[in-house]
């Protein structure tokens, strides 16, 4: 729960020794905040901590709607580093395992064995909970140099995800083999982006 801001404009390097407060709600960094602003931010932080404490009291209890329907709450993950939060927060499983992060963490195409181990670790750690794995969604906002994708004016609608998988079949088959092998170690479903 550490707030972070990206693509910040007008960052100055002469902030050494100055207090800075990151406000993730409003995407702001306050340098040398006024006492009133600091007090306001501290108050909001305390309110957040109270809300988290209330949510913690719900852990382990059924997720039931006002009309009596029980629902499962699933988490989204990018890999093994997120599994602890799934377990800690009592998620019913994983609704989206973004496998492109396996690719983003590599400097070359990940091997079948490398992928198998990554998927197996997650599945074993969460078994018997369901894990919905999305095949590689590279392209648009997530790219890797080794794939050598051409620039597109509108990459969100262009050559990405399943389109890449269907034209680079060796790449796709490697991932599918790794997923099929790993499926023996947990409750896995596969979705295609």
Residue ranges and their predicted role:
Residues 52-193:
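Conserved alpha/beta-domain cores
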